[in-house]
Swiss-Prot record:
Membrane spanning stretches: none
UniProt-listed SUPFAM superfamilies: UBC-like (SSF54495)
Name of the featured protein: Protein crossbronx-like
InterPro entries: UBQ-conjugat_E2_core, UBQ-conjugating_enzyme/RWD
Coiled coil residues, start to end: none
Family under the similarity heading: Belongs to the ubiquitin-conjugating enzyme family. FTS subfamily.
Domain named UBC core: residues: 15-178
Upper taxonomic lineage: Eukaryota, Metazoa, Ecdysozoa, Arthropoda, Hexapoda
Pfam families: UQ_con
Alphabetical list of Gene3D superfamilies matching this protein: Ubiquitin Conjugating Enzyme (3.10.110.10)
């Protein structure tokens, strides 16, 4: 008997699972210092954490969740990004801690967009918060700031009282590090856990790093440049890496099943 992938819920679910697995593989390959993984309980709910190494948010460690629409990736609705704690940023709502993606994407297009684009955007707003609120330049050369954002108080503080903004952000960074080792609020085995350094536990890894075979295996002479992205230092570096990854995707794009393809069940 023949079933259409459009009319059979089981086939649609399997197809969605392959899409999400492909998205996860891209996330693992394309990004550094920001991590995301589908939860064990539901592939539409992702756990994430970002380590910020530079800029005024340097030293911050922020956890977040990504909620995919039920019909992902066919649904044009945007993903929902919710941070675990309140964060002072113009694009993060102080009430529900959600990230505004509408300045970045108007709608989701599965043939153009990937979850790693959203993760890259998260990196960008922390690497260059001023750049994230600017829409261009006036005729006099002054930066034009957005009229409306999720957190207007943060926008006004960043634009008019930058020292106070930096002070608040640095206090926030310290608080985020103080809670980095907190016990997880869920027993989901895919929850990203950060543990303190333990010499006994990491001695084998350190020995591997010192061994000639390990150095040879991780030598820059033997590996592709994209494997050595390092941490994000500026929005310029984000743009350069974005261009590199888009070129990589063009060379090896994920094959997508035909939407109307029939599946033969025996």
């Amino acid at each position: 008997m023949w079933y259409s992938t459009e009319s059979n819920p089981r086939i649609a679910l399997i197809k969605q699972g392959y899409h999400i697995l492909a998205e996860y593989n891209l996330v693992k390959e394309e990004l550094k210092n920001i991590y995301a993984i589908p939860s064990y309980a539901c592939a539409l709910h992702w756990f994430g954490v970002i380590f910020v190494h530079s800029g005024i948010y340097a030293g911050s460690v922020f956890r977040f969740s990504i909620l995919l629409p039920e019909n992902f990736p066919d649904d044009v609705s945007l993903l929902t990004v919710v941070f675990s704690t309140g964060i002072l940023h113009p694009h993060i709502c102080p009430q529900n801690r959600t990230l505004d993606l509408e300045h970045f994407l108007k709608e989701w297009r599965k043939d153009q967009h990937h979850i790693w684009h959203v993760l890259r955007y998260i990196q960008a707003i922390f690497a260059d918060p001023e750049g994230s609120i600017c829409t261009g330049q006036s005729s006099s050369g002054d930066l034009v700031v957005m009229d409306e954002v999720r957190n207007m108080e943060a926008l006004n503080m960043l634009a008019q009282s930058r020292p106070e903004y930096i002070k608040r952000v640095q206090e926030q960074a310290i608080a985020s590090r103080n809670h980095i080792y907190d016990r997880p609020l869920t027993d989901d085995p895919h929850y990203i856990i950060v543990e303190p350094y333990c010499a006994d536990r990491h001695l084998k890894i350190m020995d591997q790093l010192k061994s000639p075979c390990w150095k040879e295996a991780t030598s820059m002479d033997c590996s592709q440049p994209s494997e050595y992205l390092g941490h994000i230092d500026s929005s310029r570096q984000l743009d350069e890496e974005e261009a590199n990854q888009l070129e990589k995707l063009r060379r090896a794009r994920i094959p997508e099943p035909h939407r109307d393809e029939a599946v033969d069940f025996l």
